A protein has these predicted regions:
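Conserved Helicase C-terminal RecA-like lobe
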Residues: 43-67, 79-194, 198
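Conserved P-loop NTPase motor "coupling/switch" region that bridges the ATPase
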Residues: 1-40
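Short, polar/flexible loop-turn hinges at active-site or ligand-entry regions and domain interfaces
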Residues: 12-19, 73-81, 105
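Conserved SF2 helicase motif VI
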Residues: 211-214
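AAA+ P-loop ATPase catalytic core
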Residues: 25, 32, 36, 68, ...
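A short linear boundary/processing microfeature
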Residues: 8-11, 71, 151
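Short conserved active-site loop signatures built around small residues
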Residues: 202
Length: 214
């Protein structure tokens, strides 16, 4: 059952980066998976180019982050050694602040250096005729990105884990046919065999530390 799978594999791999659980899952699924390399299928595709963009937090954002670090240290000191979820929650909050402080503070009236940098990348790419897949782990971040794309007049679709399968298929078809320039996708929803051949740029807004999940 799914609960057993979550306990044995999904939670240890996704939340705890358990290499042993990942190895066991690979052993179980290996005989049923045929992996084809890009070079074996489409030889005319250019090689993948990866660019890492490091963004400095603005002053307000940095102050909020440092305050969260102080709070995190206090919580971790009080946590029990076996309480892995406490560590995970602390790291997650720091990641959210880096993405956009509004993910943790509803009354935030400052900006987000990362969001601004992402929008610069997206608008420049769209103006250059590119199509983009934009991934985030946080659905609330996708909502903020969608709002900014609307303000910038950039056409886009959004796919989340709650999106029904028939709707997913229709969104994929419409994106591949050129009806939108950007496809916003939650990281977990993206791992469902989507065939998005129209995009030539992929942006991971908040890269996940577990490469297998990403």
């Amino acid at each position: 059952p799914y609960k057993t799978f979550c306990a044995r594999f999904e939670k240890p791999i996704v939340q705890e980066d358990d290499k042993d659980a990942l190895r066991r899952l690979n052993q179980l699924t290996g005989p049923f998976i045929l992996r084809r390399m890009k070079s074996e299928v489409l030889k005319e595709l250019p090689p993948k180019t990866e660019n890492l963009h490091r963004i400095e937090l603005d002053e307000q954002q940095r102050k909020l982050y440092l305050a969260a670090v102080v709070d995190a240290r206090e919580k971790l000191r009080a946590a029990k050694p076996e309480d892995k979820m406490a560590v995970f929650a602390v790291l997650m909050r720091l990641r959210e602040i880096c993405c956009d402080p509004r993910l943790v503070a509803d009354n935030w009236d400052g900006g987000s250096a990362k969001l601004e940098a992402c929008m610069e990348l997206v608008t420049a790419a769209v103006e250059g005729g590119h199509r983009i897949l934009l991934f985030s782990q946080f659905t609330s971040m996708l909502e903020l990105l969608a709002k900014r794309l609307d303000e910038a007049g950039v056409s886009h679709f959004t796919l989340q884990g709650s999106t029904p399968k028939p709707v997913r298929a229709e969104l994929v078809r419409r994106f591949n046919s050129g009806e939108a320039d950007v496809f916003l996708i939650s990281l977990r929803a993206g791992g469902t065999g989507l065939n998005l051949t129209a995009a030539d740029i992929v942006i991971h807004y908040d890269p996940w530390w577990n490469v297998a999940a990403q």
